[in-house]
């Protein structure tokens, strides 16, 4: 084993994380960037999102803003939030007079475009796209930034017990996949499983490619994260068939998706508490293929529960019906009435998940463990994501409303739309880029200036590739 590989492994080992409150404040930059983008959109709504200056603004807000939050401004997240939102607010207010003048010059076919935009917004739920895109961006940034000293160790994955931003990110990535996954159908189990296996196969292939690459190139590994051979692509790849299997097992029951998720999480947590499973995962020697990958195998149960929770939330969001008209809501648009119901659901869900997590933390005194993906971790991931989903939805309703007096403009930042268009491909490219940079640069000895140049170039490359693919309507399915 090379000394540099050993040093890099030690760099991400034995960590204890940081506070949940700080994680929330740091990741609020996602929301702040969306607010700033929405304000700029309101001022320049009749401009094309492909204008060079707009693309640059978009990239600065939704990529570099997140990068700065976990590097240079990691100790001053409130200041960074202010530096993003205050200039955008001033710029918006300063341009209100110009915006009023431009409204008088709208083209005759404007209302037709507005109707199309309303239909698209109701179908696609723009705030979901912003949420998912932001999740992918911060994930891509973190998997490389963690290898540099400029990335705080408290944000990196903990060894066993504790909370960190990257620990939350892994679970949130799975949760977000569940949110945007297709709802279950009444199709027979056999055809469903066939489709699931077909969907899982390319991702599992990527898992094997990563495994072979890591072993053959003597790349640094954090074995206690998933095991000797297991990696995150295997976790993602096995989700579709097991989700289908769970659907088949619960098909004849009336238990809702969220109930199924909680049952799986609770059953797994009981096994961790009343049997020797927890000790086996944490301390058993790695003597065979199963024990060598015990973390990845058993944590998959928790990730399955998290995915189902995300799927349950996504199903409710996409299937929320308009409330019955009343004198109190007769003046509100159907679009906003629907969003009020969604925000109400997300708020209640977030409160319940937060209360349950606090109960585990204060009464049962079981700590969060991403390595185990135990019940406190499950509750934390669900609480965080329902809270932030509600915030994204509220921002959209308040700052990105559909009104007849405004131009029919995009409702999702272009760089995030582009990332979502080829999400898994961009994630794969981020992993490849991370590997190439680690093999060509001694990340532990890089100066802060050199580090930021590398990270900005990396972000620009990923964003640029996603924009080119999106512009040319090239969707690469894995």
UniProtKB/Swiss-Prot annotation:
Question: InterPro entries annotated for this entry?
Answer: PIGW/GWT1
Q: Which GO terms describe its cellular component?
A: endoplasmic reticulum membrane
Record's bilayer topology term: Multi-pass membrane protein
Q: Is Lipoprotein among this UniProt entry's keywords?
A: no
Q: State which residues carry a glycan (glycosylated).
A: 367
**Superkingdom assignment:** Eukaryota
Q: Which GO terms describe its biological process?
A: GPI anchor biosynthetic process
The record lists the membrane-crossing segments as 20-40, 52-72, 75-95, 126-146, 160-180, 196-213, 230-250, 255-275, 297-317, 380-400, 424-444, 449-469
Q: Where in the cell is it found?
A: Endoplasmic reticulum membrane
Family of the protein in this entry: Belongs to the PIGW family.
This chain belongs to the protein called: GPI-anchored wall transfer protein 1
Specify the taxonomic lineage: Eukaryota, Fungi, Dikarya, Ascomycota, Saccharomycotina
- Gene name, Swiss-Prot/TrEMBL: GWT1
């Amino acid at each position: 084993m090379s000394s540099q590989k050993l040093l890099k492994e030690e760099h991400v080992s034995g960590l204890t994380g940081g506070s949940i409150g700080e994680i929330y404040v740091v990741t609020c930059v996602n929301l702040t960037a969306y607010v700033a983008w929405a304000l700029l959109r309101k001022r320049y709504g009749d401009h094309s999102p492909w204008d060079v200056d707009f693309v640059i603004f978009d990239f600065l807000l939704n990529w570099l803003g997140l990068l700065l939050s976990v590097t240079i401004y990691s100790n001053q997240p409130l200041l960074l939030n202010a530096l993003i939102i205050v200039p955008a607010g001033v710029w918006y207010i300063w341009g209100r007079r110009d915006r009023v003048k431009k409204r008088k010059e709208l083209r005759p076919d404007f209302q037709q475009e507005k109707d199309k935009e309303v239909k698209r917004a109701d179908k696609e739920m723009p705030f979901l796209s912003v949420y998912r895109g932001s999740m992918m961006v911060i994930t891509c940034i973190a998997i490389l930034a963690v290898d540099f000293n400029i990335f705080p160790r408290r944000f990196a994955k903990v060894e066993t017990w504790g909370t960190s931003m990257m620990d939350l990110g892994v679970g949130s990535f799975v949760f977000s996949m569940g949110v945007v996954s297709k709802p279950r159908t009444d199709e027979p189990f056999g055809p469903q499983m066939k489709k699931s296996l077909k969907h899982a196969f390319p991702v599992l292939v990527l898992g094997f490619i990563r495994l072979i690459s890591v072993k053959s190139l003597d790349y640094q590994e954090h074995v206690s994260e998933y095991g000797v051979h297991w990696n995150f692509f295997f976790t993602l790849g096995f989700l579709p068939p097991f989700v289908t299997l769970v659907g088949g097992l619960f098909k004849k029951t009336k238990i809702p998706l969220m109930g199924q998720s909680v049952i799986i999480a609770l059953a797994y947590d009981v096994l961790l508490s009343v049997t020797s499973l927890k000790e086996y995962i944490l301390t058993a020697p790695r003597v065979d293929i199963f024990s060598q990958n015990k973390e990845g195998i058993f944590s998959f149960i928790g990730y399955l529960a998290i995915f189902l929770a995300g799927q349950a939330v996504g199903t409710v969001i996409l299937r929320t019906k308009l409330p019955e008209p009343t004198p109190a809501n007769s003046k509100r648009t159907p679009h906003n009435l629907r969003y009020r119901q969604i925000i109400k659901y997300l708020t209640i869900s977030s409160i319940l998940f937060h209360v349950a997590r606090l109960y585990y933390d204060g009464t049962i005194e079981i700590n969060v463990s991403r390595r185990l993906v135990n019940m406190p971790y499950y509750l934390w991931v669900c609480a965080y994501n329902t809270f932030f989903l509600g915030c994204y939805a509220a921002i959209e309703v308040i700052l990105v409303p559909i009104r007849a007096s405004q131009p029919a403009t995009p409702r999702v930042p272009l760089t995030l739309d582009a990332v979502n268009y080829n999400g898994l491909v961009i994630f794969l490219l981020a992993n490849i880029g991370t590997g190439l940079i680690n093999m060509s640069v001694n990340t532990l000895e890089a100066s802060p200036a050199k580090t930021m140049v590398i990270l900005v170039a990396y972000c620009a490359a990923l964003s640029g590739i996603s924009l080119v693919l999106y512009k040319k309507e090239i969707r690469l399915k894995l």
